[in-house]
């Protein structure tokens, strides 16, 4: 039986830590930043852990 392919879109969006947690970038910081407050754009920086509801789906896409 052939190997399952990793979902290329998911592999670009998610990163798996050593402990198995899935990290994602925060949304909304690509464009139209001029009208967003500095406080808001600062909150959008960095990575955060994926929501529990989405973990199962993401793991399947990543082939974990």
UniProtKB/Swiss-Prot annotation:
Any one of the GO BP annotations: translation
Domain of life where this protein originates: Bacteria
Against SUPFAM superfamilies, the record matches this protein to:
L35p-like (SSF143034)
GO MF annotations, alphabetized: structural constituent of ribosome
Renumbered to this chain, region (Disordered) spans 1-20
What keywords are assigned to this protein? Answer: Ribonucleoprotein, Ribosomal protein
Gene Ontology CC terms:
cytosolic large ribosomal subunit
**Composition bias type Basic residues, residue spans:** 1-15
Please give the InterPro entries that the UniProt record associates with this protein: Ribosomal_bL35, Ribosomal_bL35-like, Ribosomal_bL35_CS, Ribosomal_bL35_sf
NCBIfam families attached to this UniProt entry = rpmI_bact
Which family does the record claim for this protein?
Belongs to the bacterial ribosomal protein bL35 family.
Give the matching PANTHER family: 54S RIBOSOMAL PROTEIN BL35M, LARGE RIBOSOMAL SUBUNIT PROTEIN BL35M
Name of the featured protein:
Large ribosomal subunit protein bL35
Q: Please give the organism.
A: Nocardioides sp. (strain ATCC BAA-499 / JS614)
